[in-house]
Amino acid sequence: DPTQPAAPVVESDQAAEVASLDNALNNPDFTSVFAPIDPQASRKKMAKQAGVEPVILMEHVTKIYPAQPNKPALDDINIEIYPGEFVFLVGHSGSGKTTLLSTLNRDVKPTSGRILVAGQDLMKIKNRKVPFLRRQIGAVFQDFKLLPQKTAYENVAFALQCIGKPKGVIRSQVPEVLRLVGLADQMDSLPDQLSGGEQQRVAVARAMVNRPPLLICDEPTGNLDPAISLGIMKLLERINRTGTTVIVATHDREMVDSMHRRVIALEGGHVIRDQERGGYGNYGTN
């Protein structure tokens, strides 16, 4: 059950872990392995000029939970995100970040509005088609969501087994993606034998092994030390440079301010700011 509690986190040798992350980030094979979208379409302006359709289109999206009928979790959201963009989603807890991300893979169905993801209308898609939609979306979470009784290799392989990939493809792609995130020597380790940063790298590998064009991350560095958080974010940035669209919900002010990427700020279910090369803004960490 992928929703089981996260495995215990072992203490890490931070210097060694940072070094292994650096080695992964300097791997020249990233571009050859992860290239689902033309990197030239990596900026919103260029994509629009080229007539490229958004990979995510949200029009007048509202979500009202029955328990809070007078307080929409999302209220008239209008967003376009283009292939190859890297977007931060910021705001207080309860501002709507997680609900917004959950609508993108149909974990949550909006009350009203329209959502297109990779050209598919999520308000009209049949339930039996949802698993096919999710194959185009990688997901990374704060608590890793690794299967505790499976090794790093088995956790990543499981993502391919679930969509019926042949054994030969699994034997080829899983070691490759683990090598690319700097875990070639940890393939046989169980989650409780890995540090938090290593567990998150397994989660990133699992999310990317099917080479989806879209990666959504909900607080991916929330439980990690600053140095390891920086490495994970650089890993996501490296994946983004190959063309993958990356959306990251985070409370990490310093990270957002240092990376100068597009920032969408939510408050009370509303988009209150959508800024190219933006900063975190005046939001607390609660």
Give the positions of each predicted feature.
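Short coil-to-helix segment of the ABC ATPase nucleotide-binding domain corresponding to the Q-loop/switch region
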Residues: 150-158
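Conserved ABC transporter NBD signature motif
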Residues: 113-121
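ABC ATPase NBD coupling module
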Residues: 122-138, 241, 283
